Amino acid sequence: MEKKFDAIIIGSGVIGAAISFELAKKGWKTLNIDKHPTSGFGSTSASCAIIRVHYSTFDGCALAYEGYHYWKKWEEYLEYKDESGLALFIECGCMIYQTHENDYLKNIIARANELQIPFEKWDPKLIKSKLPIVDTRQFGPVKLTSD
């Protein structure tokens, strides 16, 4: 039996799956090919599957902010009511520290302003009041006390 596809997509992670989904909605027959055995092995697994709108390029920020609006209406976008709650978007925010190493987020703040992406600037006192567990005296990654 000969199998024919309108599009063969290399990768079936978040990008490949999204491309396939959009083409399928337009009636295309698609095939995704991926080097990994199943989901959860790609870049999304390293990011805890968070979405963010702060990237190093203008285009990256613009595309991410456009995508954010799809995530907010995730079930509507999927055209599917997920009774199990698996396809659930939980908006929890994201906190990034302004440090010398990231040039105090100058470029990210400029892009957010240019694209009218809302954000809040919290000082250490506000951080402590909202998130008492956070130690604002250090900005490094989490590590074991034995390190």
Predicted segment positions?
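Beta1/beta-strand and adjacent pyrophosphate-binding region of the FAD-binding site
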Residues: 1-15, 31
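C-terminal lid/capping helical subdomain adjacent to the catalytic/cofactor pocket in oxidative enzymes
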Residues: 2-5, 26, 121
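Anionic group-transfer/hydrolysis microenvironments
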Residues: 8, 36, 54
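Short beta-strand/turn micro-motifs composed of small residues
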Residues: 11, 34, 98
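Glycine-rich FAD pyrophosphate-binding loop
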Residues: 24-44
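Dinucleotide-binding Rossmann-like beta1-alpha1 core, especially the glycine-rich loop
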Residues: 48-140
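Short, intrinsically disordered, charge-balanced linker/junction segments flanking boundaries
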Residues: 140-147
